[in-house]
């Protein structure tokens, strides 16, 4: 696994990047230098602009490009029990609480969260915004801000609340 991040280039979140490096993740500046083989797959969030050198390099050499949401949805949708948490606010708290309840109940859920989950923090996982389980249960935030919520097919859907945060009411009705 290799990667780049504008926060790395800006000197932010050094402890997170040091943690990744210590586990063998090769980090590159976000200048395209890490995208060198057509066999590579570039995974980026929808917040990464087409003008970012990594995206341009991937296009130039013919490397596959996908979004974080598409990759996450593929993993999420393949779980036997998928629980998607949506809404304008409270998603991270709900995912963290549900993940912890399932964990304490003896389940081994995979969890993808938008924030660190304090109950799961330990020396091997000091940030704990994600947890790899046994694949049976997958609990994740699903985001409506960029429309990627439509990629997810949860077996259980939790909608905390809906307000005019990222989309118009008509767009929200279509997504939900």
Go through each PLM region and give its residues.
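Structural motif
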Residues: 6-8, 44-47
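Structural/interface elements that position substrates and couple domains in central-metabolism enzymes
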Residues: 9-12, 27, 76-78
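Short active-site oxyanion
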Residues: 1, 39-41, 136
